[in-house]
Amino acid sequence: TVDIPLVFPNRKPHHQLRIAWTKNLPVNHWGQRTDKISLSSSKIIKNFIQKLIEEKITVQEKKFAPEYIQKAWGVFNELLSMEYDFYFPVLFRIQAKLLGNPFTVVPYSYEKYQHILTERDQTISIMEKVFENYDALVLPVTLGSAYKHVEPKYENGMLLNFMEPVKIDGEIIENIAVDTFYTNLFNLMGNPVIVIPIGFTESGLPVGIQVVGRRWSDAKLLIVAKQLFEVAGDFRHPPGFMN
């Protein structure tokens, strides 16, 4: 075995930190509105950004092209089909395709898999350019604050109720879109992510924010995320839990 030491870089002074941020990812996925977070979360994130600016941290808004986000989601879902649907009977996949699932890959082939991986590399290259000029990217974790827990239901090892309705500012959205839209893309691309708590809604529900780093820069991201939390984070122990 090779012992690779973990070396943490030095902290940058606040005025040398450069943070990119985006308040939404501009695309609707599976017919779900995913391009606008809840008003309560938006206010808290706006306050978080303002605190960073007051501490002389450079914060610049980054807007992603809808075509890029849509393409990345297509790659994510096609990979999911190739690597996960493999365990389903072929008739199940054919049925999904006939019912209009645009991401179901039928039939499988090595060439298709390599093509999807190449497209993944292309999405990674575009995202990596963001980190040429910034220490981190911050964006929402979910479309809203925490909501009432949905008890999972399984059948034959499969989660059944991942499309339960969640109300965001009066609009009904499936919980899979609420929970995963802002996180799955970084699972696809392999970026390290840290979630820090930044505030609470008027009803006391917590809101967090993702701090995303460049690939293979986990140690640096830990330092940057800690700095951002020290400046603008907000954590409270839940009632009934010891400090």
Show which residues each predicted segment covers:
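Short, well-ordered beta-strand elements
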Residues: L205-R214, L221-L222
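A short, aliphatic-rich beta-strand micro-motif
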Residues: P192-I196
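Amidase signature
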Residues: T1-F181, L188, W216, E230-N243
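Short amphipathic alpha-helices in soluble, non-transmembrane regions
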Residues: V224-L228
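Short beta-strand micro-motifs enriched in acidic
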Residues: G199-T201
